[in-house]
Design a protein with these regions (language model features):
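Carboxylate/His-rich catalytic cores and anion/metal-binding grooves
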Residues: 202-203
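Conserved short alpha-helical segments that host acidic/polar catalytic motifs at enzyme active sites
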Residues: 1-128, 133-198
Length: 203
């Protein structure tokens, strides 16, 4: 159950992960050969072990190195004692947004609809390959790669996201209506009934 909590002898942190790593099998095998012990089958643990085993002297250096090694679509949130760090994959496959509460607290979510529930104001979406660091100094933006493109997974609009969320400026419900209209234009068949893919894609 996320978030995962990691307690190493020299660091501890929490980790939440949305996505899938395409090189999870090879990374896990390599880490296990180097002595890493995994407590579950989830690929979410891989980033934590890569951070811990990095020889980079700085925490941000360790995180950037680890992020450059994992491949696939992912959004990570890491919680340390004095900061929260969020990161997005180089293609922006998964959405990740920054918001702010009325009291100044900064929040991060994979869906903008969560901000409305807690009374937060949307600030902006993370860009592909971007890292955001949130601490007592405020919000700082950084990146771990320049090899990026925005290629959001179409399933976010079709199925994963709630209809009242916005992804990179596009409302999910509106996107679904437009896709349905385009589908009707391309496939001119008389249908008895048209239904969405339950449950989360119904809007």
């Amino acid at each position: 159950i996320q978030p995962f909590l990691f307690r190493f002898h020299d660091m501890q942190f929490g980790l939440a992960h949305n996505g899938n790593l395409t090189n999870a099998t090879s990374l896990k095998k390599e880490l296990e050969e180097r002595g890493a012990i995994f407590s579950a089958t989830s690929d979410s643990e891989i980033l934590a072990h890569l951070i811990r085993r990095s020889h980079n002297p700085s925490l941000m250096g360790k995180i950037k190195e680890a992020l450059s090694l994992v491949k696939g679509g992912f959004a990570y949130i890491l919680l340390f004692e004095d900061k929260l760090i969020a990161a997005l994959d180089p293609n922006g496959f998964r959405p990740l947004s920054i918001g702010k509460m009325a009291n100044g607290a900064v929040v991060v979510s994979s869906e903008t609809c969560a901000f409305e529930v807690i009374g937060a104001e949307w600030i902006r979406d993370l860009k592909p390959g971007e890292i955001v660091i949130i601490d007592d100094k405020g919000i700082q933006y950084d990146s771990y790669t320049d090899d990026t493109q925005l290629a959001i997974c179409s399933m976010e609009y079709i199925y994963f996201a709630r209809p009242d969320s916005n992804i990179h400026g596009v409302n999910v419900h509106t996107a679904r209506k437009r896709m349905g209209a385009q589908l009707a234009r391309e496939f001119k068949h008389e249908a008895d009934i048209v239904v969405g893919v339950p449950n989360s894609s119904l809007s």
